[in-house]
Amino acid sequence: VHWSAEEKQL
């Protein structure tokens, strides 16, 4: 899956 940069902080 691919997520937004903000969710990559998790």
Curated annotation (Swiss-Prot):
Keywords: Heme, Iron, Metal-binding, Oxygen transport, Transport
Tissues expressed in: Red blood cells.
Keyword Zinc-finger belongs to the record: no
GO molecular function, one term: metal ion binding
Lineage: superkingdom: Eukaryota
Similarity annotation: Belongs to the globin family.
Function: Involved in oxygen transport from the lung to the various peripheral tissues.
Quaternary assembly: Heterotetramer of two alpha chains and two beta chains.
Name recorded for this polypeptide: Hemoglobin subunit beta-2
Organism name: Drymarchon melanurus erebennus
